[in-house]
Amino acid sequence: MHDLWPATAICHYPGGCEKYISNCYQCPMLKRNPFFDLAASVFKEKGKIGLSKITFVGCSRWIMEEAQKGNWLRTACFTSIPNPIDVTAFKRMEKQVARKRFGLPEDKFLLLFAAAKLSDTRKGAIFLIEACEKLKEKYQDRIEIVLMGNSSEELISQFPFKVNTL
């Protein structure tokens, strides 16, 4: 689990709402319908699922513990497998420090596009190029592109802005 949707009626993150702990109803995220309570209906249907053969796997101890609070999941089996990202190596840093470290300009808007193979049509580079064409006149000297992944000169040449590769 990467969010709390399995434990709630419809929310991925319930915010301050704790109705899922007892019974989801009249969800503050939904427009009210006086004739039908979608949250209550979905929560009731989720409660009918047999939990004996399901193990919920959370990506953190926190998400697992929050999901266990859910009314209909209290008897379910839970475990967590933390994300395999080294948070000491990958952490937030000041924007200017990061830009300097990667040789990126400090005075430009940067559009990042990342994929293992940037030219893979499923990744949508053509849509980014089209969007850049629309931005070109208004932001000619204020935008640069940052590409992360395997790219080609053919792809890079299609961008109307300066391209930085990492």
Q: What does each of the following model-derived ranges do?
A:
Residues 1-47:
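Acceptor-binding helix/loop patch of EC 2.4 sugar-transfer enzymes
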Residues 8, 33-95:
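A short, active-site helix/loop in glycosyltransferases that binds the activated sugar's phosphate group
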Residues 9-14, 19-20, 70, 91-94, ...:
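Short aromatic-enriched loop/helix-cap "lid" or pocket-rim segments at secondary-structure transitions
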Residues 59, 81-84, 113-117, 148-149, ...:
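Short hydrophobic "strand-cap" motifs at the C-terminus of beta-strands
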Residues 71-74, 104, 134-142:
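Short helix-capping segments at alpha-helix termini
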Residues 93-110:
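Nucleotide-sugar donor-binding and catalytic loop/hinge architecture
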Residues 105-123, 129-133:
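Conserved donor-binding/catalytic core segment of Leloir-type glycosyltransferases
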Residues 139-166:
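Nucleotide-activated donor-binding/catalytic signature segment of Leloir-type glycosyltransferases, i.e.
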